[in-house]
Amino acid sequence: MIFKLFFLSFFACALSFLHGEKPHAVFVVGTHHYSPQKSMPMLASEIERLGFKTTVINPDWDPEKDKRGLPVLEALKKADLAIFYTRFLKIDDQQLVHITDYLKSGKPVVGFRTSTHGFNYPDEHPNQKWNDGFGRDVLGSPYLIHLSGPTRLKVEEG
């Protein structure tokens, strides 16, 4: 499934080649959970070999735990593809607007692993809708809390 999403996104970006420009993929790393701060720059290097220009927003701090959030989200203004690996962010409105503007553009989006629960605003916060909305409305998959269902095991004698 991930391969299909990536393929379709890259195909959509290939249209930029028709205009003589490299498609620009922007990676937004918004957590250190599962080490995307290491894997996303490697993935960016791989797609550069395929002819993409890449920008990796990957601060030295863990944006999930640091109030500074994510720097240079303005890079999304020139993106042909946005690739998110985020988790439980509480970024301020000045940062969030760059993401929402990109989403309104209708350009392709790919979300990895924890991006279904990319935001974690308090219940009364004006941006609280993004807590479930990013996964559900943008990525097409709601966040299902792991370990929330029953696990059943039956050992068969053999």
Can you say where each PLM-predicted feature lies in the sequence?
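Sec-dependent signal peptide recognition
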Residues: 1-8
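A generic local structural motif
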Residues: 13, 67-71, 96-97
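A glycine-rich, often tryptophan-bearing local segment used as a flexible ligand/cofactor-contacting loop or short
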Residues: 84, 88-158
